Design a protein with these regions (language model features):
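Sec/Tat signal peptide C-region and signal peptidase I cleavage site
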Residues: 18-21
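Bacterial N-terminal signal peptides
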Residues: 8-15
């Protein structure tokens, strides 16, 4: 009798163990985008989600896909419209985010930012074209282009890496109309967020050519970056010759960290109010937007580097 009870107990435990394992959730395999170009000429996107939703009943819609550009006849665009009632901070205004992950590859977009200098020269607003993903183990993966719209001659490029409370930044600030590199720096929270100059191989090219008449608000420009495991290259296409002008060819590392993200990410573009980050040339430019300013996006593209994404 004892043998029978012992046998049945073992069978029960075995079945319970199998059942428990069956109920365990299998890890979800992340999905990655293949190469694509989104022209935003349809009501919905195959590649991007609209964060924050759309208000079709409102006269001040955040997102208007497939509408005509105000500055370039015959070009259909995605229009972002900021709401003056939006609170400050990234992600509080219109934003699109890729449905799946992206990784090492070539990214580019054709964008025109709003022209506000005659209307509100001290406005504090940011257009961000970037990648972003925070993971517990590897930390942040962010590569960005940013424009503080109070001065459309200036661009900000760089990365954020590191974990929560230990973030790390490399960045370059450039006046493309004048060909001036205002700064090329790195900093980290572990070091008190003090800016340190990047020199030598981390500061290439040391100078950039001026693009005559450059004004990110007056017309569309094509901006891009190429992301490799050991290198990042930010570039712009010359509006007349379509020559690729390299603005920063970053290789290697800072004394404290690499500065090059090494984990998967998402692909985004957003428009938001800042109350504490003025543009380099105007310390007063942190005002809340007074009007529903608009960003025009012609297209966004992604081409993965298959040899690195294995």
């Amino acid at each position: 009798m004892k043998r029978i009870v012992f046998f049945l107990l073992n069978v029960f435990l075995l079945l319970f163990s199998v059942s428990a394992k069956a109920k365990e959730k299998k890890p979800v395999k992340p999905k990655f985008h293949k190469a694509f170009t989104e022209h935003f000429n349809k009501d919905s996107s195959k590649f991007f989600n609209l964060n924050g939703g759309r208000k079709r009943e409102s006269k001040q819609m955040r997102y208007v896909p497939g509408t005509q550009s105000l500055c370039e006849k015959g070009t259909d665009i995605m229009l972002f419209r900021i709401d003056p009632k939006d609170p400050f901070g990234p992600g509080r205004g219109p934003e699109i985010c890729s449905k799946d992950y992206t990784y090492y590859g070539s990214y580019s977009a054709r964008i025109r930012i709003p022209d506000v200098r005659e209307v509100q020269p001290n406005v504090g607003a940011v257009v961000g074209y970037f990648t972003y993903n925070m993971e517990k183990e590897k930390g942040l993966s962010e590569i960005d282009w940013e424009w503080l719209i109070a001065d459309p001659e200036i661009v900000y490029i760089g990365t954020w890496t590191g974990k929560h409370n230990a973030l790390q930044r490399i960045g370059r600030t450039i006046n493309l109309a004048k060909g001036i590199v205002y700064e090329c720096i790195y900093r980290s929270e572990a070091d008190g967020n003090k800016n340190h100059k990047l020199t030598g191989l981390q500061n290439q090219p040391e100078t950039v050519p001026a693009i005559k008449g450059f004004n990110a608000a007056s017309q569309f420009y094509t901006y891009g970056f190429d992301w490799y495991p050991d290198r990042l290259v930010w570039w712009i296409l010359h509006p007349e010759t379509e020559e690729k002008i390299v603005l920063w060819d970053y290789k290697g590392s800072t004394p404290l960290f690499s500065g090059i993200p090494d984990n998967k990410t998402r692909y985004l573009l957003n428009f938001w109010h800042t109350n504490n980050w003025p543009v380099h040339t105007n310390p007063k430019s942190v005002e809340k937007p007074k009007y529903p300013y608009e960003v025009e996006i012609d297209w966004m593209s992604y081409k993965p580097f298959k040899e690195y994404n294995k």
